[in-house]
């Protein structure tokens, strides 16, 4: 089934509930495969001919000489396998009997194997919650007393086929299967996956630039009852290590702040030295929809650290593609601080991350003085104007001919 009809992203009965929102960009294309202005895209839920429908979403982005494969699934914790090949003819092969078995190795392949130039995975393993009531240091780690985490392997997920009519997007929406305290009685955790056929910026903050090589993830926690009066939420994220080492985490600073209330910063997870792939996000989440400056929350990422595979909720698709002998690394993302706006305001939290692939180089985009004034304040606006005057005077003087 393929998505082809434009439709807004709704939250059902939770639309007016409090929310937390975060967005991530994913990219999986080595340098030699980049530069496609457009790609032919398809979204397909791979059918399970052996039993009930499973949430296995294949995004295939075909360029002139390459193909990007993003395979998302809620079998176990929500995960994505990212593969880039150097041919427009590579295909995904799924062996359902093996994938659903206790030993899923080899149940997921991209063929031909020798066309693969890059592959990695992200696994969203746990939803974290902290009590920040008595925490005055906003940079404290952890940001409060931790509550028992919610394992995303123990979530019940919707049938994503119902969300596919939205153009080039699908939504995984779930809640704990065992919820004795009814924390999620009126709430849900949702992951919205979006693919792009060309470069553009989304309409809502943080408005990160995406290209035909990227895939965007938006995470929203809506309507769930916090276990404390000042609960902070977070996500535990795991990825494959590179041999004995972990991928690198970097901060990229830029003056391009027209599109985000964050402080001129991008955080990015980089695979490979070129790099061959990345996950990129603004260090900001939102406690209201639509997001804006007044509802912006800081987003903090912990350093990556090696993690034992058995200590993490296992993803069948990751093991099916990469096998069982892998090194994992993990990090935590936390949203909000003990002071200021928070999830407790409206029970809403959202985070957005654009990108898999080679990160864009913080390009400067045209901005208006009004945008610079609001982002930098009056002194910043004066500095910008003064620099412009000096530049014009310099050009004017340079037009005079020297007199001997």
UniProtKB/Swiss-Prot annotation:
Annotated Pfam families: NCU-G1 (PF15065)
Glycosylation sites per record: 65, 134, 159, 186, 229
Q: Which InterPro entries does the UniProt entry name for this protein?
A: NCU-G1
Membrane-spanning segments: 372-392
Subcellular location, in the record's words?
Lysosome membrane
Q: Describe its PTM?
A: Highly N-glycosylated. N-glycosylation is essential for GLMP stability and for MFSD1 lysosomal localization.
Q: What Gene Ontology terms describe where this protein resides (cellular component)?
A: lysosomal membrane; lysosome; membrane
Could you tell me which residue ranges are on the Lumenal side of the membrane? 36-371
**Which first-to-last residue range defines the signal peptide?**
1-35
Give the chief site where it resides. Answer: membrane
Q: Does the keyword DNA-binding apply?
A: no
Q: Which GO terms describe its biological process?
A: protein localization to lysosome; protein stabilization
Q: Where is this motif: Lysosomal targeting motif?
A: 400-404
Annotated keywords: Glycoprotein, Lysosome, Membrane, Signal, Transmembrane, Transmembrane helix
Q: How does it sit in the membrane?
A: Single-pass type I membrane protein
List all topological domains (Cytoplasmic): 393-404
Q: What does this protein do?
A: Required to protect lysosomal transporter MFSD1 from lysosomal proteolysis and for MFSD1 lysosomal localization.
Similarity-based family: Belongs to the GLMP family.
Which protein is depicted?
A: Glycosylated lysosomal membrane protein
- Species the sequence originates in: Pongo abelii
């Amino acid at each position: 089934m393929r998505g082809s009809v434009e439709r807004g992203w709704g939250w059902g009965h939770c639309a007016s509930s409090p929310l937390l929102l975060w967005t991530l960009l994913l990219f999986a294309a080595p340098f030699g495969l980049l530069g496609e202005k457009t790609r032919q895209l398809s979204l397909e839920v791979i059918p399970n001919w052996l039993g009930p429908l499973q949430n296995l979403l294949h995004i295939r982005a075909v360029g002139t000489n390459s193909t990007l494969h993003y395979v998302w699934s809620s079998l176990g914790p929500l995960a994505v396998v990212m593969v880039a090949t150097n041919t427009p003819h590579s295909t995904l092969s799924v062996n359902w009997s093996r994938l659903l078995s206790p030993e899923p190795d080899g149940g997921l392949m991209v063929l031909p194997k020798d066309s693969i130039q890059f592959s990695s995975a992200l696994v969203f393993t746990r939803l974290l919650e902290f009590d920040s009531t008595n925490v005055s240091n906003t940079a404290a780690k952890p940001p409060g007393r931790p509550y028992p985490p919610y394992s995303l392997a123990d979530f019940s997920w919707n049938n994503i086929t119902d969300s596919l009519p939205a153009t080039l997007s699908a939504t995984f929406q779930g809640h704990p299967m065992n919820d004795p305290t009814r924390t999620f009685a009126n709430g849900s955790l949702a992951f919205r996956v979006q693919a792009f056929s060309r470069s553009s910026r989304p309409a809502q903050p943080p408005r990160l630039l995406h290209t035909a090589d990227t895939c965007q993830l938006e995470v929203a926690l809506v309507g769930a009852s916090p276990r404390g009066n000042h609960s902070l939420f977070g996500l535990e994220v795991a990825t494959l290590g590179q041999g004995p080492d972990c991928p690198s985490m970097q901060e990229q600073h830029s003056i391009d702040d027209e599109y985000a209330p964050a402080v001129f910063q991008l955080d990015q997870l980089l695979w490979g030295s070129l790099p061959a792939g990345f996950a990129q996000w603004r260090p900001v989440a939102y406690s209201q929809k639509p997001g804006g400056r007044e509802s912006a929350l800081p987003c903090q990422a912990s350093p990556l650290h090696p993690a034992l595979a058995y200590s993490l909720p296992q993803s069948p698709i990751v093991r099916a593609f990469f096998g069982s002998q892998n090194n994992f690394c993990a990090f935590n993302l936390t949203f909000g601080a003990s002071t200021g706006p928070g999830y407790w305001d409206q029970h809403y939290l959202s985070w957005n991350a654009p990108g898999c692939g080679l990160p864009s180089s913080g390009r400067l985009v045209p901005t208006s003085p009004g945008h610079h004034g609001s982002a930098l304040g009056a002194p910043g606006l004066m500095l910008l104007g003064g620099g412009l005057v000096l530049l014009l005077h310099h050009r004017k003087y340079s037009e005079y001919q020297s007199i001997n």
